[in-house]
Amino acid sequence: KKIGAHPGTRKLYADKLATQGLGESLGDDMVKAYRAAMDAGKHTVDPVLTNFKSKYAVDWSPFLGKKWTDAGDTAIPLAEWKRLAEKITTIPDSVTPHQLVKKVYDDRAAMGRGDMPVDWGMGEHMAFASLVASGYPVRLSGEDCGRGTFTHRHAVIHDQKREKWDIGTYVPLQNVADNQAPFVVIDSILSEEAVLGFEYGYASNDPNTLVIWEAQFGDFANGAQVVIDQFIASGEVKWGRVNGITLMLPHGYEGQGPEHSSARLERFMQLAADTNMQIVQPTTASQIFH
């Protein structure tokens, strides 16, 4: 009762302004003006950013009003394929890779020359290489992204003769061209919800970057289900905000344990509506590339 009878902060402040000669109705007038501004859709506070340029700080307009069924040209010339393949399979003499990793890169070099069929890891690497070479940044984050869940990526080469852990790594995709866009690969902490939430926010602020969160195994997406349900699946219809984040959910590698065989794609199918997301299960290396 005492709390209920006590004047609120607004009343106390309005009374103080009144005692200073600013008028008895100033408090009520400010409330009416504030509510009228909200009803009119006007800004009620000054934006924090001094260079606030439009309704949103990030311009997503080039990506709005498009049809997902429109075909996109994702091919690159054969000469560019070979150039990029050579770049991402060349390891400096100062770096000594593990013998198994060297075999992977030797095979990729053969794939780039056309001497071997392209596998999934090479298809993915070539996709990343063509993007950064064209000026589009790539950001890959997850619990085992450098190596890749199925030991298929090896985006980070560890020098076997290095003396310090933080010195002696080489990332071929960071050495595609002098003026290339950034390629970032992060072995994240083991907190799916925290990492996916961060990457969702990163992607919402940078429409021209391919932002990927990769579950170490697709099953582990259940640790980030709140972010998937509340933001990825429904953020656009709730808040009118689009987001280009990509989730990679490697799964189906039997024999790895009970939590490593299913990405539970049926859950994503249930969340899909009104073109809010694309659910893709590629079956060839070319599909990975394109």
Residue ranges and their predicted role:
Residues K1-H290:
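Flexible, glycine-rich loop/tail regions that form catalytic "lids" or insertion modules at the edges
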